[in-house]
From Swiss-Prot:
It catalyses: an N(4)-(oligosaccharide-(1->3)-[oligosaccharide-(1->6)]-beta-D-Man-(1->4)-beta-D-GlcNAc-(1->4)-alpha-D-GlcNAc)-L-asparaginyl-[protein] + H2O = an oligosaccharide-(1->3)-[oligosaccharide-(1->6)]-beta-D-Man-(1->4)-D-GlcNAc + N(4)-(N-acetyl-beta-D-glucosaminyl)-L-asparaginyl-[protein]. Gene3D superfamilies: Galactose-binding domain-like, Glycosidases. Disruption phenotype: No visible phenotype under normal growth conditions, but the double mutants engase85A and engase85B accumulate very high level of free N-glycans carrying two GlcNAc at the reducing end, but their counterparts with a single GlcNAc are completely absent. Belongs to the glycosyl hydrolase 85 family. Its EC number is 3.2.1.96. The keyword Cytoplasm applies. GO terms for cellular component: cytoplasm; cytosol; vacuole. The keyword Transferase does not apply. This is Cytosolic endo-beta-N-acetylglucosaminidase 1. Residues 1-21 are annotated as: Disordered.
Amino acid sequence: MSVAPPAPSPPPFDPTKPSTPISFPIKTLQDLKSRSYFDSFHYPFNRSSVPLRRNIGALSDRPRLLVCHDMKGGYVDDKWVQGCGNNAGYAIWDWYLMDVFVYFSHSLVTLPPPCWTNTAHRHGVKVLGTFITEWDEGKATCKELLATKESAQMYAERLAELAAALGFDGWLINIENVIDEVQIPNLMVFVSHLTKVMHSSVPGGLVIWYDSVTIDGHLAWQDQLTENNKPFFDICDGIFMNYTWKENYPKASAEIAGDRKYDVYMGIDVFGRGTYGGGQWTANVALDLLKSSNVSAAIFAPGWVYETEQPPDFYTAQNKWWSLVEKSWGIVQTYPQVLPFYSDFNQGLGSHTSLGGRKLSEAPWYNISCQSLQPFLEFNEGRNSETIQVTVDGREASYNGGGNVSFRGKLKRNAHFTARLFKPQLQLSAAPISIFFSVKSDKRSELSILLHFSSPSQEKKSMLMVPNESINRFGDMFLPCLLTSKQTTSGWTVHETNLVLDGHTLTEISAFCSRPDDLTEETNTLEYFALLGHISIKSQQKAKVYPLASSWVIEAHHVKFVPGDSGSKTLSCKLEWRLKHPEEDSVFPKYNVYAENLSSSEYRPRKVMEEPRSEKVFLGTAHVDAYYVSEMVVGSDVKGVRFVVQTCGEDGSWQELDASPNLVVEVERVSSKLCCCGLI
């Protein structure tokens, strides 16, 4: 009986070789010192593309909320920069409750995957990477790191350079090992120099010290601000306290910190390991105490909900857990604050992908970079059949992306129901604004948008955007706002209205559920179902104009064909594009990438798309000006592949495919050996 030999081990990861873009940490001081990360094929893909939502310098002068990721060791589904197919991956969407997000792993230098920085920045949340040393290996690392004052400064500068280049906001420093007391002065140099360089290289840069090693070099978690850890606190932007503190520690720490009490972040371990209040479903007990003690909080490992598979399902359990945080801590972010404003309620994962109501793909996907501004939905426990349940739903139809807000339940004939969507602080001028939103509903359900305003004299106004036939019913309750509506072929209705409210501030956006006037059923209470696909607010004076296809240079690099079965091949290549003459307003948040197979009769290179010849297949979304096509199967009859790059605007608009830049890669004849070609 013969035994098949074991399959060969995959070759070790070589970051300099072309492959599907991933995020990864830096594991050694040598790699940090050599700056080898910048030579990686993956580096350009790992740059975040979304600046902090507003120019936030110093953090707000109030108790703040820091959230430390720590989910299954880090770099799971989120390591795939262009996304992956696991739509059951871990995500966070309650960004309006937090000020700072830390991406954590146990590698020496944890670089946040760009998806977290992109979506956190979109919501106004700062993002930190982690520098950690632990136990005996960490002691040896620190001995090298802190050998001289110059080495301490050099490594600090390397960390600051990485944050600036990749677009995140700073570092959590966690030295969890003993330090030779003689090296403590150089540790102080490392922390103070890193703080100084971060402040000068990244606007609003932030360095936070973890309560671990003490000023005498002992590994002794203090759990509060003391003379043993305060010297580190004094030379950086804050301290993340270990999570085994006692009831009186927060107030005592606030007294010692004085004017910097909000820079003290008391740790809460959501797993409940020795943490005050027990963590888990009673994490709010600790939050309540910290709020009353007038210090900040640091939530560690909220992925507990996901890792322990809390019932009934991740989505429900996640919303329930974060609702406890909201009740204790309150909302700390407001958006929108500037125009344009756009949200399609995308949570960064879904079971399909749509554009303008048309499905581009039925494939499940996960890409947190695609998460749009998240609604401030209120969590209501229990499925009360007599009320309307409001949820973000990735299974039902989407107008754009893979999400929507779903309204399901029962509603009486003459009743209405409102649900909070956003808490803006949007100052309006004399310039008219346009508001768009898309709805898909059954004939018995009507969905509108309710806007709340505050005048310069603090007078409150509410304006309901309703179709013309419904104005009489609600005119005595709200100021009516006429809509124009356009039906799409996919069953979505896109509503539009224009407003001028000079000097007013938009303070809330809500959904408004009601029944149509021409309801024929005699039953008083009926099932209600409607989907809200997107909402967009933009200035009429700034209509998006997309560059012509001829304005772009698009290239293919690292083109590789590998023979497959029955004459087929796989194609891998890196697509890159740039404007020939970039302008100030030529920065785009994302690009949709498509591929179109060309037979011999269809193949001819051209600069501009003409009549569509064959189906263009959606490949994915890029958030930088490059996309890696990995092992795409090309049939034996295909002579060329046309790649199309569709530019998308921050107002939710997109360039028509026929006007988008494109490039044809000619399919080579390949033998049984690997065949590669270079620049197309």
